[in-house]
């Protein structure tokens, strides 16, 4: 079996993994609360309902935007 490393960028920082990851798995791994974020993959805003079924591919650029309430 060939093990292909996947290289992506998360908020402009390099991130490597040894297998494809679902976006939801990545968010859990990075300890993000998926209810308070917006995600762009390659400049496309992704609806929360697709987090479980979307997989990160080699060379993807992921932007995780944290939504902060205030007053």
Curated annotation (Swiss-Prot):
InterPro entries linked: Beta-grasp_dom_sf, Mopterin_synth/thiamin_S_b, Thi_S, ThiS/MoaD-like
Transmembrane regions listed in the UniProt entry: none
User: Where does it mainly reside?
Assistant: plastid
Q: What does UniProt give as the signal peptide span?
A: none
Q: Under the cellular component aspect of Gene Ontology, which terms does the record hold?
A: chloroplast
Query: Its domain of life?
Result: Eukaryota
Record's PANTHER family? Answer: SULFUR CARRIER PROTEIN THIS
Q: What is this protein called?
A: Uncharacterized protein ycf40
Organism whose genome encodes this protein:
Porphyra purpurea
Gene designation:
ycf40
